[in-house]
Design a protein with these regions (language model features):
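The feature marks either
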Residues: 35, 145-147, 236
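Outer-membrane beta-barrel porins/channels
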Residues: 46, 157-490
Length: 490
């Protein structure tokens, strides 16, 4: 499941209020905007393009032929979405029906779900970025805003919603619904980076980048389990709990219970939790205007390229090895406590209260999760950013004007790693002209191709060209830069 790039940007940066409908859409769909380095790895099709500076993000040892100055924002803007469940056309339907809780219980939606549904999204844009050659060294600097998110939702969550709508024939005298697993992670920060690439000799180039990180926000919600159990006699197996009334429930005898184990950790300016009369979180408010720096961290990229001769080269890199330390004053920890969610028909009104908790029609049911903020746990916390490994092999032909390459990348993301294999064909007739055709068969199930081109100052590229409404992943990078002088050695 996935949400469109524009929706995610709105969700992270401009949303004035995180309404329940938006939360439902996020829980059903979510997130990943940019390419897969867990926070803006560049499009993989750039890896073997010697004229593209964006490949430095994949491997700091791969310096471009010329220096550059990226124009603010439009010098480097990239985004991507990926899901293991739904295509881009389904995303449009999800956003269109975000206010309609019934949509997420329809056969059309439910039939496309897997046992565990993953989605991820990341986005990045440069505030400023530049690089230039000095002798055999290439220096670069950047200030980049990055955002990424990952979501996992079990199908059982939607099965339970359908149960509460009376869509499944259930024996409520011995009903048990176990919902295991599920988490949401969102991270937003600014990267201040300085990179250096050194051509050691004709065979070896080394590169590295050190980064200071300014954390703007981090949210981690994990649900280990949710168990709903009833031992109720006298109920219709097809009961729609969302329309149940006290008269209908008065016929029932027995007990019911809800047991949830969940944890919420967050650090962000402008993120406020509203509490119910019983003291648990029942609403979330986000004020984008109050967003600021509430965490500091550091990271590094390391890379190497080895060319045994003029025709072949091997390369490897690890990027985004780092962490962010979030301040105590902006950190909230909350834990579920459902000890009071036990109901007995002998207690007047108990079953109606049970109905109010379980039949909200929301995928993210805060009333059922019963998250209580622990003031004693309001202390600093540390989170890792998502690192990526890259391994490449390249063959150069036609006096270095044609390149054929293979690239393997693995993003060490949560809740699952994302691996991709990219086969690339590149034609580089002039220093300011570069064209690439690529094919990445794993993440998109072999249903898409990649294209990239650099025409003077303009760059456009994608690893997954939109080809059908069922495409489950898509990314794009657009950039405009001012070219500077090239390297002065052979």
């Amino acid at each position: 499941m996935c949400i469109s790039c524009c929706f995610f940007i709105e969700y992270c940066f401009t949303m004035k209020r995180l309404r329940p409908a938006c939360m439902r859409a996020a829980i059903v769909a979510l997130l990943v905007l940019a390419t897969a380095t867990g926070n803006a790895q560049s499009v993989r099709s750039t890896y073997f393009m010697e004229g593209a500076q964006y490949r430095l993000q994949l491997n700091p040892a791969l310096a471009p032929e010329r220096g550059y100055i990226n124009l603010p924002v439009i010098g480097h803007a990239e985004a991507s979405v990926r899901s293991n469940t739904m295509g881009l056309n389904d995303v449009v339907d999800i956003i269109k029906n975000a206010d309609d809780a019934d949509y997420f219980t329809t056969d059309k939606f439910y039939g496309k779900l897997k046992d565990m549904n993953h989605a991820s999204a990341t986005a990045a844009t440069d505030v400023i970025a530049a690089g230039f050659w000095h002798g055999k060294g290439f220096m670069s600097l950047n200030m980049t805003v990055k955002a990424d998110g990952n979501l996992s939702v079990p199908r059982e969550m939607f099965s339970f919603m359908r149960d509460m709508k009376g869509m499944n024939h259930n024996d409520y005298s011995n009903y048990l619904r176990d919902i295991n697993g599920g988490d949401l992670n969102v991270n937003v920060y600014t990267e201040l980076g300085f990179g250096y690439t050194r051509v050691i000799n004709d065979h070896v180039s080394l590169g590295g980048r050190v980064k200071g990180l300014l954390g703007h926000g981090n949210v981690s919600l994990k649900m280990e389990k949710a168990q709903i159990k009833t031992n109720l006699e006298g109920l219709d197996p097809d009961l729609d709990w969302t329309t149940a009334d006290p008269i209908m429930l008065a016929k029932a005898t027995g007990s019911a219970s809800v047991d949830v184990k969940a944890t919420l950790e967050s650090s962000a300016h402008g993120l406020n939790y509203k509490l119910s009369r019983d003291g648990y979180i029942d609403d979330v408010e986000f004020k984008a205007g109050k967003m600021g720096v509430c965490g500091l961290g550091a990271a590094m990229d390391l890379g190497i390229e080895y060319s045994p001769n003029d025709m072949f080269s091997l390369s490897a890199a690890v990027t985004d090895l780092g962490f962010i330390r979030w301040s105590k004053g902006n950190t909230v920890r909350a834990y579920s406590n459902t000890s009071d969610l036990n109901y007995d028909s002998n207690n007047p009104g108990d079953l109606m209260r049970f109905t109010d908790v379980v039949a909200t029609g929301k995928a993210l049911n805060l009333d059922m999760m019963r998250l209580y903020i622990d003031e004693q746990e309001a202390k600093a916390r540390t989170t890792n950013i998502t690192s990526t490994m890259a391994l490449g092999a390249e063959c150069r032909l036609m006096e270095n004007r044609m390149h054929i390459g293979t690239l393997f990348t693995n993003r060490f993301s949560k809740p699952e790693n994302q691996s991709e294999l990219t086969f690339s064909f590149n034609y580089h007739p002039r220093s300011l002209l570069d064209f690439t055709f690529s094919y990445s068969p794993i993440l998109c199930s072999g249903q898409s191709i990649g294209l990239a081109m650099k025409l003077g100052p303009l760059f456009i590229g994608t690893d997954y060209l939109y080809m059908s409404k069922n495409t489950k992943c898509c990314n794009a990078l657009v950039g405009i830069s001012v070219p500077l002088g090239g390297r002065s050695f052979d």
